[in-house]
Amino acid sequence: MPYIGSLKVNQFRNLADVDITPHSQFNFFFGQNGAGKTSILESIYYLSVGRSFRTHLPQRLIQDNTDRFLIFITLYNGTQFIPLGVERDCHGDRCLRINGETASSWSLAAKRLPLCSLSAMSHRFLLDGPRVRRQFLDWLMFHVEPSFFSIWQRLQRSLKQRNAALKAKLPLGEITHWDKMLVEDGERLHQLRQNVVTEFKPLFTQMLQQFLPAYPLIGHYFRGWSEKYSLMEQLQINLKQDLQRGYTQAGPQRADFRLTLRDLPAQDILSQGQQKLVTYALHFAQGLLLKEKTGISPIYLIDDLPAELDANKRDCVIDLVNCLESQVFISGIDPNEIRLPPHSTLFHVKHGKVAAL
């Protein structure tokens, strides 16, 4: 399994100078609110995907009165440790380096450093719009389906061009010119998603049984257009409305994965704590499928695990993560709230300083 052997963070939020050696399995960061616990997890996330899970404004990630931040790790890939790092300055310039070479695309870092991130707002997975759930499915395909990323990139280009033509109200021929490419890649993307969902659902059911055995949720995949029509037929049917609205209404960019209980939306029945456990089950199943398909376990980032969970559920989460045989970074206020296994390292975070205990 991949794991982070060392982590250095400079001038990232309130983390002025962090240099730690994480445990290859369990790492628990504790301290008061605002100490910098979440920022540790956020820095790892940023290095993997090139963005934050807390803000869309990257300038907020740079520590006050400084002009840049640096995140650097050594990553064990199964045979050796490789260096992976990023530097970003206040002008927006950033440099990603992998194994001593400048990387041309952040997808290279994401492939090397697969993460399952569970933030303090994880329960929002069920409440927010379908975009976050599409991203959940697409994360899986990115890591298990070699053809996915090129298909997804082509689809985004075709969709962008078609929407621009619709918004500008160009002649119909210039709008429908993009339909063939959009349909070809859209149908292929849908098939990939459908295949992944079919493999994913039994694993999700297995995980959910551990957390909420009395709540047999059912997952439903919606491809983004009517089951009655092909995508080409749907685009033709919608063309008049698409012109009026200035964008493409149907297609894989409208797909969703919804959970129901007794034919009702899960979020209408479950408490916030239960929704959090459902999201944990989803992401643990995601990691299991990645391991089944590739032999690689993701690294888990679990922010504020104790919140809204009683002691039994917290122990259940820890036991499940332990069975996943992955490296995990967990944050919380009180270390006594978590029953950590022996193979763990505790880190105390205070005023942006991190010390192993």
Swiss-Prot record:
Matching InterPro entries: DNA-binding_RecF, DNA-binding_RecF_CS, P-loop_NTPase, RecF/RecN/SMC_N, RecF_2
A GO BP entry: double-strand break repair
Gene3D superfamilies linked to this entry: P-loop containing nucleotide triphosphate hydrolases (3.40.50.300), RecF/RecN/SMC, N-terminal domain (1.20.1050.90)
Binding site for ATP: G31, Q32, N33, G34, A35, G36, K37, T38
Major location category of this protein: cytoplasm
Keywords assigned by UniProt, alphabetized: ATP-binding, Cytoplasm, DNA damage, DNA repair, DNA replication, DNA-binding, Nucleotide-binding, SOS response
Signal peptide bounds: none
Gene Ontology terms, MF aspect: ATP binding; single-stranded DNA binding
Record's subcellular location: Cytoplasm
UniProt superkingdom: Bacteria
GO cellular component terms, semicolon-separated: cytoplasm
Membership in a protein family: Belongs to the RecF family.
PANTHER family given in the database record: DNA REPLICATION AND REPAIR PROTEIN RECF
Function: The RecF protein is involved in DNA metabolism; it is required for DNA replication and normal SOS inducibility. RecF binds preferentially to single-stranded, linear DNA. It also seems to bind ATP.
Protein name, as recorded: DNA replication and repair protein RecF
Species: Coxiella burnetii (strain CbuG_Q212)
Gene behind this protein: recF
